[in-house]
Every structure is written in C-alpha cells, then in structure tokens.
Amino acid sequence: RELAEAFHLPDTDNLNEEKLNDSIIWKFSDYTELTNENRKLLQEETGWSDEIVNAIKTSEEADVYKSAGLKDVNGNLERTDIDWGAKIPQDRIDRMRSLFGDEVADKWSDKTNLDLIREGKAPYGPDGERVNLHHIGQKPDSPLAELTNTEHKTNDGILHDKTKVSEIERPVFRKEREVYWQNRYNELTNQ
C-alpha cells in the first residue's frame, strides 16, 4: 500500500493487497539482474573495474552505459564524446538573456565546456544538454557515470529503483558534482 501511495495510484483502498503488491513488483521486475557470470562477461567485454561492474544491478543498466560508450577512468565511467572547445549553446545564452539580462548572458556567451568544468559546472553533451552525473547502483559512495540528459531521462526506470527512497543527499551531491567536474578539468589539462 505504501508503494501505491508513493506512486499516487488512485483508489488503492478498494484494491486487493496481494494484487496491488504483485502489480507493483511486476512493474519493477522487468529487468534482468546481473549474475556473477554476467558480471564476469561484462568486465571482459568492457574492461570496467570490479567496483563499477559490482555496482551495476541489471543487464539493462549495463546496456545504458555500454550504449553511451563510457570508459572507466579513475573508477568512474566517463564520456569520450564531449567537445571541450564547444561554447554554451546559443539557445541557452538566449534564455539567460531573457531571464537575467545582457550582462549575465554576455558573461557566459564565450565560455566553453572546458571553462564550465574548471568552475565545477557540468559541460554540454552531444545532445545539447548538460551532462548528468549518475550514481551507479544509487549509493552515495557509488562510482559515477557521465550520461547525457537524454540518456538519463529516457532510462530513468532502468537507472533508478523507484521502489525505495533515494539514498543520495541532494546538497552533498551538489558539492560532489562541483568537485567531480573540477577534478575532470585537472585530469584533462594535466595530460
């Protein structure tokens, strides 16, 4: 019943408790849990570390990261398709201008993705949206995966266990993201 209320299902008082639980479990059991054998094969295929592979819960989740072409670097899954010299998309600058005025928009108009990460801000990905950091396995100390906004949104149900409350503390994660992107800047500029 708590899950039904969490998902705002209508008229749960008149539903049979067993049928309600079965329907909710069915909704979230469409995914294939990774077996030890699957984990071994995934690691051989991708070269990802034990920490990353062990944090992945389902084969569908693994497919999201593989399809994104993510590479294991320093225990996180990084994108290889970010154009670091690309400027902030013009539609974003135009939006800044309409919301905050010329002074703010002009300040940001010449900034590149590399400039953004130096300041601890997410770069723009190939979909023209900010890159999202995702905790693989949804634990606060999980490895991070760089996903486009599109990948993160369209795979929401695969990446996030909707049957439980998130363990990620948003204020802590906000600071973690800032430090992550600054470290990524240092990694890129010290090569």
Regions found by a protein language model. Give the residues of each.
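Nuclease and nuclease-like effector domains acting on nucleic acids or nucleotide cofactors
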Residues: 1-131, 137-191
